[in-house]
Amino acid sequence: MMGENRARVVALVVAVVVVVVGVAGNVAAAQAAVTVADLQRVAGSLQMYVDALPQMAKIRGYGFQRGQAVPINLTIGMYQKTWKFHRDLPATPVFVYGQCPDSATFPGPTIMARHDVPLFVRWENHLPASHILPWDPTVPTAIPKNGGVPTVVHLHGSAHPPQSDGSAFAWFTAGFAEKGPAWTQATYRYPNVQPPGNLWYHDHALGLTRANLLAGLLGAYVIEKPEVDTPMDLPCDDDDLHLVIADRSFNVDGSLYMNSTGVAPNIHPQWAPEYFGEAITVNGKAWPFLVVHRRRYRLRILNASNARYFNVSLSNGLPIHVVGSDASYLSAPVTVSNLLLSPAEIFDVVVDFSQSPTAEIELLNSAPYPFPTGAAPGPLNGKVMKFIVQPNGPLDPPDNSTVPDHEVPYASVTALPPTTMTRYIVMYEYLTPTGQSTHLYINGLRLEDPVTETPKSGTTELWQVINLTGDNHPLHIHLGMFQAVKMQQLVNLQAFTDCMTAVNDAVKCNVDQHAVGPVVPVPDHEKTWKNVIKVPPGFVTSVVIAFKLVDTNQTYPFDTTAEPGYVYHCHILDHEDNAMIRPLKLLA
């Protein structure tokens, strides 16, 4: 992403002189310089496939009364503890979610919610006075006056009231001692009114999202709807597994590594445009193994990395049957040989290990980093985990699961009422004269600037997302579900970029005369209602967004117009924190 490739497509070059001495509250700022070679030596010293893949504890997000599912209240805390990422690595200090310190895990417990049964969660901050990782006060950041680690929880992919969205400004420190300007309540309400699917929860504090997630504040969340799920006969129980993938680098003492010096330290002393770890963890273990039998397994794969894309495939060519993406099923399964996941993206897949020609299968990664034009993965970050296939035992139950020939026929984008508004969403990156990234904006605006995206609740909009940077960006829009319908390359890109740099207006810069290049088809396994879409560089990506429930075409059963509103942003966390994020305010 850096250097000439990036320089060709940036929207503006800036030279900013900022003098910052130290990094406030940064306990790691004084660390000796650590090189990539140092990190690779630590990661390379860890033998692959010696730790079994764990499954995180499941918390049922509903109760039962007279045989009916009913709402409940949960309390989930954030704690500092140590976690063993590998047999041969010292225990690592982490921040993690759990119902108590002893049960807190990396990633956090999986919350199993029931469709149309509200869940109330009190999120409590029990973190220490200072962070375990470096952070940068020169990007827009929640900085409490009296110390502490600001946190706030966002349920990614959920339809919920604004007060429960986890606004970046709704942060709070331990014991609610200090609270951000948008903080409203300690208990969040999740109505679970949307279609069944896979979500995840994670930290969303202003300027600290990248550090807080890197430290471990993330976990899976599932909305089940038995009348939809059960008839499909997908693999279930022990054959239904989560794979939460996250790259991490480790210091020699086992602690998590995050850079202490930025790429342009005279501007941002610590911030860097992407974090790439040398070790690949799955469910909190570095390069684990999983023993499977010759039967079908359902794998809910979440890329919880800060910036790394994963293009996963099975080493023996076994096909991957995609049945869902993010928080919805597909209308019918799609079989692929490889699967590209952006950060924050989820794919729900079935793998039939009864068809495996080998007893061992590696899950491989071939995605360049940064994506799409960076370096190819090496022998460490090119491998994810191993499956060890064993024969079925005499006591194993028969495999009655299927890959269904059809799933959930949600309304297609063409069947929805016409879009009520077309908006141009432009992604910019700003560089120093020597080509170092300083910050990223959407439409040339900051999060703190006045809101410009004000859709009406219950409507459908078309967003033309223009990417003038060198990176692919995972776009996440809170509340709404959406899908890319067209990706068209821009021609005469530099001329268009120069015009946009000058006037910041796609219509005045005649975008229609530039958006005439080749059309790249949206992959079939992404043609569903999603929570993250990939926006390729140098393209206009047409995105249809439904600000309503896509399975019923009904408006939300809560007030979407309340404060503090919602946001949309790039889900490369280093970009989101500086500051590729904008407010989204729904109107009645």
UniProtKB/Swiss-Prot annotation:
Binding site for Cu cation 4: 473, 570, 575, 580
Domain of life: Eukaryota
Glycosylated residue positions: 73, 259, 303, 311, 400, 467, 553
Name of protein: Multicopper oxidase LPR1 homolog 4
Free-text function comment from the UniProt entry: Multicopper oxidase that may play a role in the maintenance of inorganic phosphate homeostasis.
Compartment(s): Endoplasmic reticulum membrane
Tissue specificity: Highly expressed in roots and basal stems. Expressed in leaf sheaths.
One Gene Ontology term of the molecular function aspect: oxidoreductase activity
Pfam families reported for this sequence: Cu-oxidase, Cu-oxidase_2, Cu-oxidase_3
Primary localization: endoplasmic reticulum
